[in-house]
Amino acid sequence: RGMRQRAALARALTMDSQVLLMDEPFSALDKQTKNILRDEIEKIWMETKKTVVFVTHSVEEAVFFGTSVVLMGVYPGGIRKIVPIELERPRQIDSKEFVELRAELLKLLRKEVEKVAKQAG
């Protein structure tokens, strides 16, 4: 499955469209395959510079790929915050800046979940 997913993502990035939507592209992959594919996709993206709308529930994926992260609210739905991602490329997931930004986004998400739980409760 990982090889097919890798080939499909590579084909999508090399297509001639100006905008590419990637909706949870790594969700069915194991961690090792995700890491390999993530690095390959980043290389291809850096060469093509396509606009990619990357939908994910993974904060790590969002920080790794994004130029900005759009945090969505649960109820009522909508954009809660747009966070610019200004980390240099290639990105290192173990760098201090990456870890701090991931923690900041997780904190914002937690606040949103707590707010919704309080309203429901």
Question: PLM features: residue spans?
Answer:
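Hydrophobic anchor residue at the start of the ABC signature
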Residues: L9
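Helical segment within the ABC ATPase nucleotide-binding domain
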Residues: K34-K49
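Conserved beta-strand-loop-alpha-helix hinge in the C-terminal portion
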Residues: V74-E104
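Conserved H-loop
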Residues: K49-V55
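Conserved signature/switch motifs of ABC ATPase nucleotide-binding domains
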Residues: M15
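Catalytic Walker B motif of ABC-type/P-loop ATPase nucleotide-binding domains
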Residues: L20-D23
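Conserved catalytic segment of ABC-fold P-loop ATPases
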Residues: F64-L71
